[in-house]
């Protein structure tokens, strides 16, 4: 293990050393670039693009391109990128993560690698965590830097219409959010008109801002385009009515994993309540699913921590556990959201089925090159390396960091902790020092707010109930007298700049009300203070009654803290490296557990990923092809040849002709397509291979059918193009219908496969095996349906507008206009299941 850690550390140092060599070359060109006129920058860009087309590599162009971008940044924004920002930019170009502390200028850093990679002619996507940041960079001076350099810049947000999205995706540089990128990908892969695709270029390079938030915190969040399904709402209400009758002895909660199950006594109670013999009988699978969701909703999901209730609009809102923001329009998956609605007595919305889905883990792995920036990635470097093949390189700060990080204050009870916290706030507020108070839940933020009001301390509160003015509140958090309470969000993407005279007061004071289960979130909170060499202060206040201590420490930590207080002769606050290490150990344990779980889920998701890429690849070929008639003909020929094989099993020179004709006319062809005597002659001729002869006969039937349909359209020149469009429409609609069913079948399989472990079988192997069977069956049904539909029925006037799809994130619906937008992705896999 020690050797492994040394190897990682040395590789990081080596990467930084190489980056310094390159950065020095960039710096050496500074004087040369300063001599350029403003009009020369676009000309230089054209020259660099030409050099790339003539064979120069991006690595060879890097020094000049970075120097040019650096000078352009200086002229447009008035800010000159620091040497350390050039280092960060080199790391980004190499497809790695630049860990840059708060205030070190990640925004300027991204300009250089984005510009360089756009010289290749392929698009560069700069991904932000919210639309505010994407719009800010696109509309502001950062976007102007690219325009000054002769690059086109686009913005991709929910409010953009279809034409605007298409135009944005054609730009050299695209500012976008992660969710909009993913939804455009899914929408494009449900499109039936090639002209409607919004993404017609390859996924070449992405720079992900706050990369840990998107690729770690939201890694498990599935992007889903979904449709409503018919589902009785009474089951949710009945299941909720049942769980309200339960006592502690009826269920078991595992605090570490937050899972809940009925005990034997609880199962018996359920069977009596619902008047059934066996709750786990397959016929009661739906009831069991509803009961489990009701249990989770009642005992593991907490209002104002996991979700909010908007009684005015009658809805349950998810709280993002990593940002503290409410997520309007989203739903918890698998019926859990409906269970919460039943619990809170608001209108129960329809449950949904999945039309298309992808996780951020798999979506961002579609890029040829991926890089990212954040101030807090080192604690997750194993995951970035294992899942995304990216190294985390710590970039030195421009000036030394002088923030004072004090040891945690520890307490036995919450009351003692809150009293000490208010005392600290009051003391610092009297000096007019700005204070940022970090909480982990909305509930705690409101408790602190009430206590501050009692002490007549004016403050701002920033949580899921009040985030509309987030940027404005955070921007003012560094002024004298400012007291700001922030829930898990401390305004990432917006710097807290110190007001006049604040440095003399010690800078911004950051006070954490408890440890988060992730060290990264704690580090993000600390990182709000001490930017760019400013003074700052941070300390956490923790108690044995904190959730983290309760889940993992139990009474043990309470006894330790009580003992320490006696030893230190303090009735309340004390500090201890041992207790701090204990909490850090818990955090590492949780982080490791979460990483293992994400890897575990990714293993399952990879099965669906392979299947999705096969389907989307074939679908894309059909959608954009100008030879769809040949593709369909090949598919039909292959399908029919396979279908008739059982009729020639015993003897390839003969078969039961009437049985064969009946089979083909029932399944694929119109009645009276085949002449009995002709088929008898083909199938029972001892001088020829009957199977080969009949397969050629079938091919002629297919060609004749397609030609007659084509002739029908070509009678009218205005309708000539409808034949190919009709073939595409039928083929794509059948693929989509079956694939959407398949996704839901795979989801059901995933939910139910856990039970096989009881039979001493590996659940993943079973999922893989059963998933392959489902996929193969789907492929066969698609091929059969396409063949039968085209051969049996006329499709001359079968064009119809496809239904609107609803967009879902975390299985959450969103009825806004963004559901109309589309986009595509070139999938690397080239497997073709039908031809």
From Swiss-Prot:
It is an enzyme of class 7 (translocase). GO terms for cellular component: cell envelope Sec protein transport complex; cytosol; plasma membrane. Its EC number is 7.4.2.8. CDD domains: DEXDc_SecA, SF2_C_secA. GO terms for molecular function: ATP binding; protein-exporting ATPase activity. Keywords: ATP-binding, Cell membrane, Cytoplasm, Membrane, Nucleotide-binding, Protein transport, Translocase, Translocation, Transport. Transmembrane segments: none annotated. Belongs to the SecA family. Part of the Sec protein translocase complex. Interacts with the SecYEG preprotein conducting channel. Has a central role in coupling the hydrolysis of ATP to the transfer of proteins into and across the cell membrane, serving as an ATP-driven molecular motor driving the stepwise translocation of polypeptide chains across the membrane. This is Protein translocase subunit SecA. It comes from Onion yellows phytoplasma (strain OY-M). The lineage of its organism: Bacteria, Bacillati, Mycoplasmatota, Mollicutes, Acholeplasmatales. The gene is secA.
């Amino acid at each position: 293990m020690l050797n492994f850690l040394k190897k990682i550390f040395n590789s990081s140092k080596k990467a930084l050393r190489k980056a310094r060599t390159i950065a020095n070359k960039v710096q050496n060109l500074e004087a040369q670039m300063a001599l350029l006129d403003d009009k020369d920058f676009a000309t230089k860009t054209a020259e660099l693009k030409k050099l790339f087309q003539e064979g120069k590599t991006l690595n060879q162009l890097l020094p000049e391109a970075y120097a040019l971008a650096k000078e352009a940044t200086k002229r447009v924004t008035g800010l000159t990128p620091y040497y350390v920002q050039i280092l960060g930019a080199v790391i980004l170009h190499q497809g790695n993560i630049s860990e840059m502390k708060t205030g070190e200028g990640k925004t300027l850093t991204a300009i250089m690698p984005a510009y360089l990679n756009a010289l290749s002619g392929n698009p560069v996507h700069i991904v932000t965590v919210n639309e505010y940041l994407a719009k800010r960079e696109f509309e502001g001076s950062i976007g102007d830097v690219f325009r000054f350099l002769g690059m086109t810049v686009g913005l991709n947000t929910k409010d953009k219409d279809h034409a605007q999205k298409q135009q944005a995706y054609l730009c050299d540089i695209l500012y976008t959010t992660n969710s909009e990128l993913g939804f455009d990908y899914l929408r494009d892969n449900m499109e039936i008109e090639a002209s409607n695709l919004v993404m017609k270029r390859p996924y070449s390079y992405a720079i992900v801002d706050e990369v840990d938030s998107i690729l770690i915190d939201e890694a498990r969040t599935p992007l889903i385009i979904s449709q409503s399904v018919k589902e009785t709402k009474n089951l949710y209400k009945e299941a909720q009515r049942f769980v309200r009758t339960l006592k502690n002895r009826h269920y078991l909660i595992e605090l570490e994993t937050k899972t809940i199950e009925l005990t034997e006594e609880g199962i018996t109670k359920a069977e009596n309540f619902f008047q059934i013999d066996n709750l786990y009988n397959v016929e009661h699978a739906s009831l069991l699913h509803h009961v489990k969701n009701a249990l989770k909703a009642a005992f593991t999901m907490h209002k104002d921590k996991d979700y909010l209730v908007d009684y005015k609009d009658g809805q349950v809102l998810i709280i993002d556990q990593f940002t503290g923001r409410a997520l309007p329009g989203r739903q918890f998956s698998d019926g859990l959201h409906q269970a919460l609605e039943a619990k809170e007595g608001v209108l129960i919305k329809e449950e949904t089925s999945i039309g298309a889905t992808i996780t951020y883990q798999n979506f961002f792995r579609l890029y040829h090159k991926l890089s990212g920036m954040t101030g807090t990635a080192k604690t997750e470097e194993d995951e970035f390396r294992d899942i995304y093949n990216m190294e985390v390189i710590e970039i030195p700060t421009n000036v030394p960091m002088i923030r004072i990080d004090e040891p945690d204050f520890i307490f036995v009870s919450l009351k003692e902790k809150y009293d000490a916290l208010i005392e600290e706030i009051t003391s610092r507020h009297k000096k007019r020092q700005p204070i940022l108070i970090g909480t982990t839940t909305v509930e705690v933020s409101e408790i602190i707010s009430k206590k501050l009001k009692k002490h007549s301390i004016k403050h701002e509160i920033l949580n899921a109930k009040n985030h509309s003015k987030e940027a404005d509140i955070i921007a003012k958090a560094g002024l004298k007298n400012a007291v700001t309470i922030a829930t898990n969000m401390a305004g990432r993407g917006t710097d807290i700049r110190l007001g006049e005279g604040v440095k003399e007061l010690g800078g911004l004071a950051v006070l954490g009300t408890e440890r988060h289960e992730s060290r990264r979130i704690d580090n993000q909170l600390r990182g709000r203070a001490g930017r760019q060499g400013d003074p700052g202060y941070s300390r956490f206040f923790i108690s044995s009654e904190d959730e983290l201590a309760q889940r993992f420490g139990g009474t043990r930590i309470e006894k330790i803290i009580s003992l320490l207080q006696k030893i230190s002769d303090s009735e309340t606050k004390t500090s201890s490296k041992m207790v701090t290490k204990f909490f850090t150990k818990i955090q590492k344990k949780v982080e490791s557990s979460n990483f293992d779980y994400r890897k575990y889920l990714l293993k399952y998701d990879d099965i669906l990923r392979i299947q999705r890429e096969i389907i989307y690849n074939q679908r894309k070929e059909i959608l954009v092809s100008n030879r769809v008639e040949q593709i369909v003909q090949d598919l039909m020929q292959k399908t029919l040849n396979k279908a008739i094989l059982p009729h020639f099993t015993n003897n390839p020179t003969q078969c039961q002709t009437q049985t064969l004709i009946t089979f083909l006319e029932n399944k694929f062809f119109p009645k009276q397509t085949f002449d009995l005597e002709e088929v008898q002659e083909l199938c029972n001729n001892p001088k020829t291979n009957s199977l080969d002869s009949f397969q050629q006969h079938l091919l002629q039937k297919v060609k004749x059918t397609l030609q007659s349909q084509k002739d029908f359209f070509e009678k009218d020149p205005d309708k000539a193009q409808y034949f190919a469009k009709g073939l595409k429409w039928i083929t794509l609609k059948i693929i989509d219908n079956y694939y959407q069913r398949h996704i839901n079948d795979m989801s059901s399989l995933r939910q139910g496969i856990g039970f096989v472990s009881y039979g001493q079988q590996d659940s993943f192997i079973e999922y893989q095996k059963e998933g392959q069977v489902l996929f193969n069956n789907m492929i066969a049904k698609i091929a059969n349906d396409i063949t039968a539909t085209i051969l049996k029925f006329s499709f001359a006037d079968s064009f119809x507008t496809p239904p609107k799809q609803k967009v879902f994130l975390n299985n959450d619906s969103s009825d806004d206009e963004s559901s109309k937008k589309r986009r595509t992705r070139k999938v690397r896999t080239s497997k073709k299941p039908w031809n």
